[in-house]
């Protein structure tokens, strides 16, 4: 059952800021995501930028507490739903088109929202794996949206067939991501390694960013834009 604390706070601001159209737009977008995630549905499109500019707050100081609340939206998604990366249906359609019928392996899939979305589009060649070792994370109990094989990423790479590898929001507290990249290089992987993360900041290890050769793909970023201060993007990695 969804903890409604955040949702109720948004509803309160929806009432108190009823005359501010921009606030209403952001509040309704955030509420829609919470309602959808609670019943295992993905947002139809990318969230708008949830923060307000300094100019907007100076014009209407009543926005400041709402801005503070919305700055914690991603953390709420993590602690309540186990969602670090939030895919949307438009982006998933782009991803599915890019994959073009190839075999997909999603590693460190978490609750499997990306795989769930691809399978909902009829993609039957996608496999999701996660070791589910979430101790000391902000959420420690998994709530998979789809079938996920409980496998360590390195073992999955060695035992499952794939043409495309997807890794999103790998933790910055371990160097598993470097081991994965080194394995793909050592085995001369010629497919696509799709990465979702923020270079040198909130995702992945520093060692990974220092060695990864990144290419930003316009097609995979067209319907993905950060909704907060974390500038995660979609890359191909070599």
Predicted regions and their residues:
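Residues at the starts of beta-strands that form the adenosine-phosphate
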Residues: 103, 124-125, 192
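Conserved SAM-binding loop of SAM-dependent methyltransferases across substrates and taxa
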Residues: 111-123
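A short SAM/SAH-binding and catalytic strip from SAM-dependent methyltransferases
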Residues: 162-177
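C-terminal substrate-binding/active-site "lid" region of AdoMet-derived donor-dependent transferases
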Residues: 174-238
């Amino acid at each position: 059952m969804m903890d409604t604390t955040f949702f109720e706070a948004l509803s309160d601001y929806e009432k108190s800021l009823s005359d501010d159209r921009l606030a209403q737009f952001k509040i309704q977008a955030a509420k829609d995501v919470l309602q959808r995630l609670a019943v295992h549905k993905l947002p139809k499109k990318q969230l708008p930028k949830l923060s307000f500019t300094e100019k907007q707050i100076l014009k209407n100081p009543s926005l400041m507490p709402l801005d503070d609340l919305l700055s914690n939206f991603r953390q709420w998604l993590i602690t309540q739903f186990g969602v670090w990366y939030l895919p949307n249906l438009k982006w998933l359609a782009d991803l599915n088109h890019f994959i073009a019928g190839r075999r997909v392996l999603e590693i460190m899939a978490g609750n499997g929202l990306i795989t769930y979305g691809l399978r909902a589009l009829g993609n039957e060649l996608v496999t999701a794996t996660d070791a589910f070792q979430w101790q000391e994370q902000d959420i420690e109990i998994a709530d998979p949206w789809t079938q996920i094989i409980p496998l360590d990423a390195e073992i999955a790479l060695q035992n499952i067939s794939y043409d495309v590898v997807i890794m999103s929001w790998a933790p910055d507290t371990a160097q598993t991501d470097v081991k994965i990249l080194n394995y793909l290089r050592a085995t001369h992987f010629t497919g696509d390694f799709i990465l979702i993360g923020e270079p040198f900041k909130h995702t992945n290890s520093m060692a990974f960013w220092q060695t990864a050769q990144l290419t930003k793909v316009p097609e995979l970023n067209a319907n993905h834009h950060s909704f907060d201060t974390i500038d995660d993007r979609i890359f191909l990695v070599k």
